[in-house]
Amino acid sequence: MYTRYSYNPSLGRTYVYDNKYYKNLGAVIKNANRKKHFIEHELEEKTLDPLDRYLVAEDPFLGPGKNQKLTLFKEIRNVKPDTMKLVVNWSGKEFLRETWTRFMEDSFPIVNDQEVMDVFLVINMRPTRPNRCYKFLAQHALRCDPEYVPHEVIRIVEPSYVGSNNEYRVSLAKRGGGCPVMNLHSEYTNSFEEFINRVIWENFYKPIVYVGTDSAEEEEILLEVSLVFKIKEFAPDAPLYNGPAY
């Protein structure tokens, strides 16, 4: 039996490997995988090279096109804790003829050809009482069965927090996007009801949106609900003049 002071022949015995001929197995496998991934990544990038000629906006709301805002309504709602309240149910108050007519006349001149690229539902939320400290919550569904009647109040289940500007924005564009209708002013003038159904809801989703707060008390909030139209404009056809000045 060896003590701490006795001699142990195995102490100090070492094995020296020449690193020139021996390599760590894990390092070899990792290096091979790294090379394989690099080759695959290069091939994938080459297939995407033709797309370098195009520009896209990270946020479609800030992309090319003109934003035209249509304020649908402003209301004060009381929201109880742990619940969310339905904001928009498209029952009719969102489609007041006077509001839409004024918007169409101001935003869509008769002489211009314009196309709706996207429609955003924008909900701005503000507390009505001062010195309240809570965050706004929101939840939405883009589509549902036509016969579905949404509940006015639901319990909070996996909502998303609204941003620092207290604005909740939802893009309503269907896959493919865009609204292939030119000269929207004349389309609207022909028939208001047909314009809403055939132009708006034929090309864009009709969403259901709920809002709430993370407060433990009942809160009173001011809601401003609006639709923002992303417009693509085309220059009108200029007539050709023949005369001494030209």
From Swiss-Prot:
Keywords: Viral occlusion body
GO cellular component, one term: viral occlusion body
Transmembrane portions of the chain: none
Keyword Disulfide bond carried by entry: no
Keyword Transmembrane tagged: no
Family statement drawn from the similarity comment of this UniProt entry: Belongs to the polyhedrin family.
Descriptive protein name: Polyhedrin
Lineage: Viruses, Viruses incertae sedis, Naldaviricetes, Lefavirales, Baculoviridae
Gene symbol of the encoding locus: PH
